[in-house]
Amino acid sequence: LVGSEMCIRDRHDIDIILTVNKSKVKKIDASGVSIISSTPDIANARIEFEDGCIANLTSSRISLKKMRKTRIFQEDAYISINFLEKEFQVVKIRDKYECEAENSLIVKNNLGEEKVIFFENPKVQSINSIEAELNDFYESIKCESDSKVSLNDGIKALEVAEEIMRLLWV
């Protein structure tokens, strides 16, 4: 998101978001701040989908701590993905009667209904995602098969990335 050199890397993050949520993109907002350069050094993008899901992407080249984090909000869940640390957290909200799990917390909502919040930290395979995508593309050519990321999926992710970049330079 920050600077044109980061657009390619962030396109992969956008592709993941578009894969997680198949709903159409309804609205994109983005803002950035230039602090040490003529282009945004810190940027935030918000992608709103027609089904109500919202994805927030944050990127900074001057943060004290390197960060590439995506947060996805939907009606009954919150998903946080830290691409640099390879951490993935899922928080789901269910009715209390559905079940209780070890990593859960019972809370009351504003209507007095008891809900169960489940916390999950799925294991993330430590791979170089760009290298894996290039290998998949190579194998699809070699074996004359479809790649995991279709041309249309790649174009959609690139269109979203380009819209974010356009909004950052308005």
Regions inferred by a protein language model and the residue ranges of each:
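Short, small-residue-biased leader/transition segments that mark boundaries at the very start
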Residues: 1-8
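Oxidoreductase and adenylate-handling cofactor-binding alpha/beta cores
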Residues: 9-34, 46-53
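Glycine-rich phosphate/pyrophosphate-binding beta-alpha loops
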Residues: 11, 58-66
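Histidine- and/or cysteine-centered catalytic micro-motif in compact active-site loops
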Residues: 31-33, 50, 59-62, 75, ...
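Short glycine/serine/proline-enriched coil/turn segments at secondary-structure junctions
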Residues: 35-39, 63-65, 80
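C-terminal helix-rich "cap/oligomerization" subdomain common to oxidoreductases
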Residues: 50, 132-170
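C-terminal glycine/acidic-rich active-site capping loop/insertion
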Residues: 76-148
